């Protein structure tokens, strides 16, 4: 069985790093529409712990995960996990 790599998205919430397709800033209009569509299809996961949403993570299962961390922080964490292999 292979080891699973977990990406910390804030407040002790984690996502399987291999399933992440995109990390985007939450303010863009297309991302807001994506967020609304995910909510309608019950594929929206709020991992902000009541804080302001700064990043939106899209997974290969079409789930949209909201994070209060900056997109650059999440991207850096993903790069570090990928570099470790």
Please place each PLM-identified region on the residue numbering.
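Short aromatic-glycine motifs in intrinsically disordered, low-complexity regions
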Residues: 1-15
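Short, charged/polar surface micro-motifs in flexible loops or helix N-caps
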Residues: 14, 26-31, 40, 61-64, ...
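Structural recognition of short helix-loop-helix hairpins that underlie histone-fold modules
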Residues: 15-18, 44
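Phosphoinositide-dependent membrane-docking surfaces
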Residues: 17-25
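Compact, glycine-rich, soluble single-domain proteins
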Residues: 30-49
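Short, structured protein-protein interaction patches enriched in aromatics and acidic/basic residues
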Residues: 46-60
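C-terminal structural segments of small proteins and small subunits
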Residues: 56-85
């Amino acid at each position: 069985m292979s080891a699973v790599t977990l990406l910390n998205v804030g407040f002790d919430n984690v996502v399987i790093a291999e399933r992440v397709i995109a990390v985007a800033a939450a303010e863009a209009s297309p991302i807001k529409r994506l967020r609304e569509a995910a909510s309608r299809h019950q594929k929206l996961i709020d991992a902000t712990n009541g804080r302001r949403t700064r990043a939106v993570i899209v997974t290969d299962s079409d789930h949209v995960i909201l994070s209060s961390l900056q997109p650059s922080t999440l991207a850096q964490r993903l790069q570090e996990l990928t570099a470790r292999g």
